[in-house]
Design a protein with these regions (language model features):
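Short, surface-exposed, charged amphipathic helix/loop patches that serve as local interaction elements
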Residues: 14-15, 19-117
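Short, intrinsically disordered N-terminal pre-domain segments
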Residues: 1-12
Length: 117
């Protein structure tokens, strides 16, 4: 099991440990499968279905981040106050870590660097 760290200064001054344990890899796959399933069902849906899908995807993403980083209630509240784009960046980085990617590989894949790290 590899242990990585992720800095999220908006939540904590201390870096969070990210364990690439089977438990977290399972969480990552559950999150990805849920997002894919929701995306498939709302693709041709009406406005209400699309709004419900967006809501469900956000809830899945927040739950995934909270579980992997083991956030307490106070830190989770701080996560809720982040911009959606930043929350997506965190989730993408965690997914990359579960696949064994390095920070450099993640930066190359997105073509940008994260000024907060």
């Amino acid at each position: 099991m590899e242990i990585r760290t992720i800095k999220i200064p908006e939540i904590s001054k201390k870096a969070f440990e990210v364990f690439t344990s089977n438990r977290n890899v399972l969480r990552m796959h559950e999150y990805q499968l849920a997002v894919l399933k929701i995306s498939d069902t709302i693709e041709d849906g009406d406005t209400q279905e699309q709004a419900q899908g967006s809501y469900s995807i956000l809830k899945e993403m927040l739950g995934f981040i909270r579980a992997v980083l083991n956030l307490n209630d106070e830190d989770y509240d701080k996560l809720l106050d982040l911009e959606n784009k930043r929350t997506q960046e965190i989730a993408e980085k965690l997914v990359g870590y579960m696949y064994g990617l390095t920070d450099e590989q993640l930066e190359n894949a997105t073509g940008e660097t994260d000024p907060k790290d």
